[in-house]
């Protein structure tokens, strides 16, 4: 990671790198972001190339002063120096990139661990509560979010009154269908992929797969093309895109099925962690759904936990609507690295 000496010197570079886009910003002062840039991952052969493009576009006065410290969150496990991204053909050595870019400090962590760091800093106007009561301040918090994949992390309290962000790969747990219809969709996915993880169905590609399975396996949902892009399914379901193929009902049902499946996975995570501090949903899909998510089967499925239905019914679920929460989390993660001496 390099030296932590004078790591509070600003500006500090933060970057949230997902499977589709890379979002960069400069932290000019504690938790104050500027020069936010969103770069399409497909436009760059490597993470370093994307970072160089962002740095090259900074105002001359900032470029002249230089950026010495950086923290990057990536949609991938971070298990050592060598990193190969799961949803993009980028691979790099953290130390080699630090040296190549001339940083004194270069922190790399899982993107959902970075987002977990942000949870204590999100304002009430950046969170939409979907059911439950009030959160318990010093209890574990669960985090998940469907986008290109399905990110999962947690924020756990310590005896010192702080929180520790824990990265995980919970998106790759085996998907468990909850009714006969979901069994049919699961079988459709299993024939194609073998192992059916939660991410196979609860992600952008998962929404596409659900839509495809509905048309392929159920007479009721024959209208429309065999396959559609996730963005189009969502837009048609929300009435934002013209329904020229007559499959609005199929798109809406695909979204509702997706939300119900997410409710199952979110509840499993909540009871595993004892997440009385709340369950937080980020990613690119759910915040986009707006009221359609609140009115979906999500909460009903979330509370469908048999003997533990009362336990999860009290747990609040929050949809994150902050514009760049991962970047705020990276600022906090950099501070945490300084405090812990790592």
UniProtKB/Swiss-Prot annotation:
<comment type="similarity">
    <text>Belongs to the bacterial glucokinase family.</text>
</comment>
<keyword id="KW-0614">Plasmid</keyword>
<keyword id="KW-0963">Cytoplasm</keyword>
<protein>
    <recommendedName>
        <fullName>Glucokinase</fullName>
        <ecNumber>2.7.1.2</ecNumber>
    </recommendedName>
</protein>
<dbReference type="GO" id="GO:0006096">
    <property type="term" value="P:glycolytic process"/>
</dbReference>
<keyword id="KW-0808">Transferase</keyword>
<dbReference type="GO" id="GO:0005524">
    <property type="term" value="F:ATP binding"/>
</dbReference>
<dbReference type="GO" id="GO:0005536">
    <property type="term" value="F:D-glucose binding"/>
</dbReference>
<dbReference type="GO" id="GO:0005829">
    <property type="term" value="C:cytosol"/>
</dbReference>
<dbReference type="GO" id="GO:0004340">
    <property type="term" value="F:glucokinase activity"/>
</dbReference>
<keyword id="KW-0067">ATP-binding</keyword>
<feature type="binding site">
    <location>
        <begin position="15"/>
        <end position="20"/>
    </location>
    <ligand>
        <name>ATP</name>
    </ligand>
</feature>
<dbReference type="InterPro" id="IPR050201">
    <property type="entry name" value="Bacterial_glucokinase"/>
</dbReference>
<dbReference type="Pfam" id="PF02685">
    <property type="entry name" value="Glucokinase"/>
</dbReference>
<keyword id="KW-0547">Nucleotide-binding</keyword>
<keyword id="KW-0324">Glycolysis</keyword>
<dbReference type="InterPro" id="IPR003836">
    <property type="entry name" value="Glucokinase"/>
</dbReference>
<dbReference type="InterPro" id="IPR043129">
    <property type="entry name" value="ATPase_NBD"/>
</dbReference>
<keyword id="KW-0418">Kinase</keyword>
């Amino acid at each position: 990671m390099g030296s932590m000496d004078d790591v509070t010197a600003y500006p500090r570079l933060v970057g949230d790198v997902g499977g589709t886009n890379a979002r960069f910003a400069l932290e000019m002062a504690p938790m104050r972001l500027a020069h936010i840039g969103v770069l399409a991952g497909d436009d760059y052969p490597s993470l370093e190339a994307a970072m160089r493009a962002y740095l090259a576009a900074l105002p001359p006065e900032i470029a002249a002063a230089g950026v010495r410290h950086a923290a990057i969150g990536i949609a991938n496990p971070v298990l050592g120096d060598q990193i190969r991204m799961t949803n993009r053909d980028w691979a790099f050595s953290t130390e080699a990139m630090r040296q190549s870019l001339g940083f004194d400090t270069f922190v790399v962590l899982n993107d959902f661990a970075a987002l977990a760091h942000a949870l204590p800093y999100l304002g009430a106007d950046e969170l939409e509560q979907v059911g439950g009561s009030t959160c318990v301040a010093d209890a574990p918090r669960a985090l998940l979010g469907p986008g290109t994949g399905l990110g999962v992390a947690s924020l756990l309290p310590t005896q010192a009154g702080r929180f520790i962000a824990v990265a995980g790969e919970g998106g790759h747990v085996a998907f468990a269908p909850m009714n006969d219809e979901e069994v049919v969709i699961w079988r459709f996915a299993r024939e194609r992929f073998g192992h059916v993880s939660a991410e196979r169905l609860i992600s952008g590609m998962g929404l596409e797969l659900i839509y495809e399975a509905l048309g392929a396996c159920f007479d009721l949902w024959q209208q429309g093309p065999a396959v559609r892009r996730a963005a189009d399914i969502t837009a048609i379901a929300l009435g934002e895109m013209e329904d020229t193929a007559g499959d609005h009902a199929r798109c809406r049902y695909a979204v509702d099925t997706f939300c119900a499946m997410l409710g199952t996975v979110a509840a499993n995570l909540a009871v595993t962690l004892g997440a009385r501090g709340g369950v937080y949903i980020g990613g690119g899909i759910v915040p986009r759904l707006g009221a359609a998510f609140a009115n979906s089967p999500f909460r009903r499925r979330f509370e469908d936990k048999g003997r533990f239905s009362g336990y999860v019914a009290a747990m609040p679920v929050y949809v994150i609507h902050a514009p760049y929460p991962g970047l705020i989390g990276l600022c906090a993660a950099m501070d945490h690295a300084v405090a812990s001496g790592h």
